Amino acid sequence: MKIAATIARYLLGAVFLFFGSNMFLHFLPMPPLPPGPMRQFTEAMATSHYAYGVAFFQVAPAILLLVNRYVPLALALLAPVIVNICLFHITMAPGGLPQAVLVVVLWFLAVHPVRSAFAGLLKQRA
């Protein structure tokens, strides 16, 4: 399980570093967007520069995962990003849902060895 978790951590870090840095460097061409809510959402994210904040919270934790430092913090920072990726694909682009599910699986595999770091968050009472 330790090897699987390490591989998952590196893959998760690589995925978020690659796609997060694409927002800053634009090395992947964007396909034309279909009309409708997905287009409006993507245009709003781009024109408001909100996407740069999201990209930062992809790249910074990705680097932490790849260098194996502050791994629980990196995983905690990626959790809301992953939830939003899943919600986006469930509601607007179901074709990308398998990739989103893969990211969720990688996240859970990476969390497993450091789950004790999150134990305090799951206490019913203080």
Q: Over which residues does each language-model region extend?
A:
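Solvent-exposed, well-ordered loop and adjacent helix/strand elements within mature globular domains
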Residues: 18-54
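Core segments of transmembrane alpha-helices
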Residues: 55-60
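Conserved interaction-surface patches within small, structured recognition/assembly domains
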Residues: 61-67
